[in-house]
Amino acid sequence: KTTQKKQTQKKAFSPKMLVYENLKNENVLKHFNNRFAQLDTLLNHPIWVQSPVINLGLNRQHTADIRNTDSLYWAKTAHEQLAIARHNGLEVTGQVYARPDAYFDADNDDAEQVSQYKAKTQAELGWNIINSKFYQGKEKKAKVALANELSRLQSKKRLTADIYEKAAEELTEQYNFYIGTIIAHRLDNLDIMNEAYQFMLEKDRISNDKMLKVMNEKLAAEYDISILCSDRDISNKPIYRMKPTRILVDTTALWHHIDQESIDARIVMVKEQIADNDSKLANYLSTTRITPFARWSSYWQSNNKISNNGDIGVRFTIPIYNENPRKRKALETEKEIIRSSRCTDVKEIKQSVGILLKRIENLNQAIATEAFHIDQTGKYIDMRRFAYKNQKQGYNYLMRMDEYTGLLESMERMYKLMLNRGLAIINIEKAVSIYDNNTIFREIEL
């Protein structure tokens, strides 16, 4: 079981220091020739791959969470608006009370005019029209809808906050694999050059500084691989060739998204709508209470008779102050604060996005330059291959290996440039809250 477990584990990269003793010239040259043949085969038959593209968007868990949260907010809004729709303003009040002493003693002639009863029952049906659906019902429904929409958007922003980090991590992991395989091939070249320099050092045909330079390059390459592909086996991999591309950005659509379509923009719009709606609700009439009513009263008189009477009227409460103009001024000021804050945020976002767009354009140019260099170096190697074969008296094996290594280094640089460009795009998408596939960025082959 232990053996099977070890076999199923991925083979990770581990650095090695090669020390050669008793080297022979023919063996060193054989290693060079074998490596040249291997590189020619790998370069002439590469594995062409598309540049890794992360379709930034919501995964299944994100989608399920957001749909569930959205449905809850919409259900909450529906229930609250239904409650408002059922609020007709009708209210029933009543009272029952008794008088222990049903008679009043008095010495004047008006004593008989005093109402005399043992108990009283009173019921009243009133219509509180101001506090009902019939007065500003549309605005009252809008108030709960806007409050829930604001909470829904803020919740959605929290739920989608981590997709950018995950996208960057996935993009980096894919590029690291291709970069790591290129470095691994370059490391194989350095191992052979290290062997050659050790042989030459034994023969006193080279100074220590050249050998140290190769060893330092080897250590740096091993360090890079240990960082990029510490948990992946990249030995004996083909050479992955990536087609160079250029990123086109629809800046008009990008600025429109920032101003109108991003979650932050929609949150600001909802906040402004809330302030507008609150301004409509803040009026003098809404602070009054006007209640038409119909009242029925029954009296148990002191002579044990029952008398009834009905009343209709209007009960009202009118404040002698009016604070609503100040409230509306405060709400207008709040809207100005919201707009000012949004303008500042948009300005900062556009500045940072502008820097990233400039970086993308610079990376586009650098990638095109590196792609041209790769193409020219490949043609140079093809041309030199025939020249080396026709040289009867031999040639400089170290120089030829440097040519292959230079090509690999150029490919490595281009892949790193393309990775940095992809990360810059993700940073823009994060800054402007793009969380789904979009047409703002378009990738074309050079």
State the predicted function of each range.
Residues 1-29, 33-58, 63, 231, ...:
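Acidic, low-complexity, intrinsically disordered peripheral segments
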Residues 20-22, 42-89, 208, 232-294, ...:
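Amphipathic alpha-helical coiled-coil scaffold segments and their short linker/junction regions
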Residues 25, 60-69, 130, 134-144, ...:
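Amphipathic alpha-helical coiled-coil segments and their boundaries
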Residues 28-60, 97-154, 190-196, 212, ...:
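A subset of solvent-exposed loop/turn segments in beta-rich extracellular surface proteins, enriched
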Residues 31-32, 140, 144-151, 155-161, ...:
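Charged, solvent-exposed structural "stalk/scaffold" segments
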Residues 43, 80, 89, 155-162, ...:
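Leucine-rich amphipathic alpha-helices with coiled-coil/heptad-repeat character
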Residues 61-66, 71-95, 99-143, 156-160, ...:
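A glycine-/polar-enriched beta->alpha junction
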Residues 269-279, 296-408:
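Intrinsically disordered, low-complexity segments enriched in Gly and acidic/Ser/Thr residues
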